[in-house]
Regions:
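Glycine-rich phosphate-binding loops of nucleotide-dependent enzymes
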Residues: 2-174
């Protein structure tokens, strides 16, 4: 039987915020095609783990591997390697339009036609964003900002998509 290599592997990850240990020995393997949910109480370290994977918070120890290779420590390098994060809390670029926010997420892509194709895919997932494409992100509702944050993360065509509190502010379609 052939052994599969995880697309993403987190091994014994430790993250400290000053004297406070936010993560102690967290480990996780994610294989291609899997949907994985990390569940825990508030303050358990779920967001910290995602931010450490992205290189947004320093790790005290442990390894993070993508396809068996050590992941860089800088977030722009992590995105270029194939991982995107839609962070908790609707972090959008408020003074930019919806289209400009989506362009910011597409920085790893160099082909303009590929960028436009990605925008079309985002607009298929979130038709409301197409209606608001020239509107400033800061004037969108909370749910629309959440859609934009997820759409922006998808623009890089990630192989691994991390979603932190993805349903925050989203209303069910009635």
């Amino acid at each position: 039987m052939e052994e599969r290599t995880p697309i993403l592997s987190v091994k014994d990850l430790v993250v400290n915020y000053g004297a406070i240990q936010a993560l102690k020995g967290a480990s996780l393997d994610v294989y291609a095609g899997e949907i994985v949910a990390v569940i825990g109480a508030n303050g358990a370290g779920k967001s910290t783990m995602m931010n450490a994977i992205m290189g947004d918070v320093p790790r005290a120890s442990g390894e993070i591997l993508l396809d068996g290779k050590l992941l860089p420590h800088k977030s722009y390098q992590v995105v270029s390697a194939g991982i995107s994060l839609s962070p908790e809390g609707r972090k959008v670029f408020a003074p930019l339009t919806v289209l400009e926010n989506l362009d910011m997420g597409a920085f790893p892509l160099s082909d303009r036609s590929q960028i436009e194709k990605q925008k079309e895919e985002v607009f298929q997932l979130f038709p409301r964003l197409l209606e608001r494409k020239n509107q400033y992100a800061g004037t969108l509702s909370g749910g629309e900002q959440q859609m934009l944050a997820i759409g922006r993360a998808l623009m890089a065509k990630p192989r691994v998509l991390l979603l932190d509190e993805p349903s925050l502010g989203l209303a069910p379609i009635i």
